[in-house]
């Protein structure tokens, strides 16, 4: 398969244990998946159609799953798995064959930070989703805390601002911010969220 560098995104990031380390947040992986999916949709609109990604547990797996889900919307988006013999070879391949780097890492993850810093030093545009979640990490609202008990649901998605009610490709996501959530209540096998405008949304609570 021919890789067009100008339309290709490289992916790297932390393992699941590193993502969750030091954070008491059962919805963080859900939020990260949503934000990754929205970013992929945005990049696709900009002409990026190929994503180079390893298959390590954690952010790389999240990206792979998000690309495959988005493939149901746009069949011409491609996921290319990268499995070189060493991390150095992986870094070289990713940087040589892409024009944008997407990652999730902080200063504790030396491996992911290594390629992130190399990309920036080389002038490659980069996006670190860890930085994009700064406000989410700082949010300690009652609504965010109340939703922590429900990390496996079907009906809406968690995002960095609150809950994503609806998203159609090419349109602005419909989001209910945490500050607009008035009540969170479980009734039988469903979760009901009441907003400050008295609108009520619900989701099924799935078994583990």
Task: Please state what every model-predicted region is.
Residues 7, 161-163, 189:
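Beta-strand-connecting loop/turn residues
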Residues 4, 157-160, 186:
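Generic beta-strand structural signal
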Residues 145-152, 172-173, 180-208:
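Acidic, Ser/Thr- and proline-rich intrinsically disordered linker/docking segments
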């Amino acid at each position: 398969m021919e890789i067009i560098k100008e339309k290709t995104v490289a992916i790297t990031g932390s393992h699941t244990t590193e993502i969750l380390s030091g954070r008491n947040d059962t919805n963080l992986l859900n939020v990260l998946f949503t934000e990754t999916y929205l970013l992929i949709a945005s990049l696709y609109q900009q002409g990026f159609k190929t994503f180079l990604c390893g298959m390590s547990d954690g952010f790389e797996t999240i990206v792979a799953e998000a690309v495959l889900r988005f493939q149901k919307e746009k069949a011409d988006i491609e996921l290319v798995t990268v499995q070189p013999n060493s991390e150095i070879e992986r870094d070289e391949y990713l940087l040589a064959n892409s024009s944008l780097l997407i990652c999730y890492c902080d200063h504790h993850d030396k491996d992911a930070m290594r390629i992130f810093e190399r990309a920036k030093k080389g002038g490659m545009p980069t996006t670190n989703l860890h930085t994009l979640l700064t406000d989410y990490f700082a949010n300690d609202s009652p609504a965010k805390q109340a939703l922590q008990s429900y990390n496996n649901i079907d009906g809406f998605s968690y995002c960095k601002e609150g809950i994503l009610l609806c998203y159609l490709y090419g349109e602005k996501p419909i989001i209910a911010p945490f500050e607009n959530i008035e009540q969170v209540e479980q009734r039988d096998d469903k979760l009901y969220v009441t907003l400050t405008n008295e609108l009520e949304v619900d989701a099924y609570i799935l078994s583990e």
